[in-house]
Swiss-Prot record:
<dbReference type="InterPro" id="IPR045865">
    <property type="entry name" value="ACT-like_dom_sf"/>
</dbReference>
<keyword id="KW-0029">Amino-acid transport</keyword>
<feature type="binding site">
    <location>
        <begin position="38"/>
        <end position="45"/>
    </location>
    <ligand>
        <name>ATP</name>
    </ligand>
</feature>
<dbReference type="Pfam" id="PF00005">
    <property type="entry name" value="ABC_tran"/>
</dbReference>
<feature type="domain" description="ABC transporter">
    <location>
        <begin position="2"/>
        <end position="241"/>
    </location>
</feature>
<dbReference type="GO" id="GO:0033232">
    <property type="term" value="F:ABC-type D-methionine transporter activity"/>
</dbReference>
<keyword id="KW-0813">Transport</keyword>
<keyword id="KW-0067">ATP-binding</keyword>
<dbReference type="Pfam" id="PF09383">
    <property type="entry name" value="NIL"/>
</dbReference>
<dbReference type="InterPro" id="IPR003439">
    <property type="entry name" value="ABC_transporter-like_ATP-bd"/>
</dbReference>
<dbReference type="GO" id="GO:0005524">
    <property type="term" value="F:ATP binding"/>
</dbReference>
<comment type="similarity">
    <text>Belongs to the ABC transporter superfamily. Methionine importer (TC 3.A.1.24) family.</text>
</comment>
<dbReference type="InterPro" id="IPR017871">
    <property type="entry name" value="ABC_transporter-like_CS"/>
</dbReference>
<keyword id="KW-0472">Membrane</keyword>
<dbReference type="GO" id="GO:0016887">
    <property type="term" value="F:ATP hydrolysis activity"/>
</dbReference>
<dbReference type="InterPro" id="IPR041701">
    <property type="entry name" value="MetN_ABC"/>
</dbReference>
<dbReference type="InterPro" id="IPR003593">
    <property type="entry name" value="AAA+_ATPase"/>
</dbReference>
Length: 341
């Protein structure tokens, strides 16, 4: 649906070249809710602006719904843009226009009939839960209601793609949750592909099925949300995951336990999925290795509606200790594991 092929973007400011994007490649599949996460300055917003051609790539290709738009003119982009909706952090509503007129604006600009405009706007306001606010003005609405108006406006033209640039950053946690639920409903009801730009890993965890992690203009990690949360490969991905889920004990706790430890030991970090959480894993391990298994840390969370568990286990070692059987057990049970000592 959206594909970036070795995309780079360079800005020239005061005779200085700034590389906003460097050799970015990934694909957003049809019906994805695809998250792009990174800190400020990572290049996220520049990336999303390439999709609707608000910016043009310096190098590489940007493919949107089968069209290579890299070198499209504004005229050539008109039909493509009809299939792309966008919402922003600060809503971008017309304060002098009613809710109804704000939502209707794309249809008015497209010179649709009054009958069609009324029908379509009414449908969208009902979908976002603001039918009773149609005659009010933006200043009379809460932040969450303003974003719902913006979503209705983005959907009113029946787009195939919805771009969300930090759409929940200005909202409180409860309102953020309600907006994410609405966006998930947009995806499921209309089959709209959503590309989420955010710096909040909780947004990725709650709504996205796939994610790209950006740092300094580069995509440093991609994968399903479950893959990235279960085994983040890069330091930045690990840092983002740790903001919403504690996946291992604190360094101070490990240091204290190591100081108290008598004899040699081996530690394992394991990731247990929902289908495995009811299995007698610890009991099985005790029987396999013939010794006690210490649980140094355990935490449970929900990712994409599935319960997952992170555990840090410790085995005391002696001459009879054999880890081959333990490793084989984890592999047979499809339990992701990592030896950490």
């Amino acid at each position: 649906m959206i594909e970036f092929r070795q995309v780079s973007k360079t800005f020239n400011k005061k005779k200085q070249k700034i590389d906003a994007l460097k050799d970015v490649s990934f694909t957003v599949n049809r019906n994805d809710i695809f998250g792009v996460i990174g800190y400020s300055g990572a290049g996220k917003s520049t990336l999303v602006r390439l999709v609707n051609h608000l910016e043009a790539a310096s190098n590489g290709q940007v493919i949107v719904d089968g069209h290579d738009i890299t070198n499209y003119s504004d005229k050539m982009m008109r039909d493509i843009k009809k299939d792309i909706g966008m919402i922003f952090q600060h809503f971008n509503l017309l304060n002098s226009a009613t809710v109804f007129k704000n939502v209707a604006m794309p249809l008015i600009l497209s010179k649709k009939s009054k009958t069609e405009i009324k029908q379509r706007v009414t449908e969208m306001l009902e979908f976002v839960g603001l039918s009773d606010k149609k005659d009010q003005f933006p200043d009379e609405l809460s932040g969450g209601q303003k974003q719902r108006v913006a979503i209705a406006r983005a959907l009113v033209t029946n787009p195939k793609i919805l771009l969300c640039d930090e759409a929940t950053s200005a909202l409180d946690p409860a309102t953020t949750a309600s907006i994410l639920t609405l966006l998930k409903n947009v995806n499921q009801t209309f089959g709209i592909t959503i590309m989420m730009i955010t710096h909040e890993m909780r947004v990725i965890k709650d709504i996205c099925n796939r994610v790209a992690v950006m740092e300094k203009g580069k995509v440093v990690e991609t994968g399903t949300v479950k893959e990235v949360f279960s085994h983040p490969k890069t330091t930045i991905a690990q840092n983002f995951v740790s903001t919403v889920i504690q996946t291992e004990p604190s360094t101070s706790l490990i240091r204290r336990l190591n100081d108290e430890q008598v004899g040699d030991f081996k530690d394992y970090k394991i990731f247990v999925e929902e289908t495995q959480v009811t299995q007698p894993i610890i009991n099985d391990l005790i029987q396999i290795c013939g010794r006690e298994v210490k649980i140094l840390f355990s935490s449970m969370s929900e990712i994409q509606g599935n319960t997952v568990c992170y555990m840090w286990l410790r085995f005391n070692m002696d001459q009879q200790f054999e880890d081959t059987a333990i490793n084989q057990y984890f592999k047979e049970k499809n339990i992701q594991f990592e030896e950490v000592h």
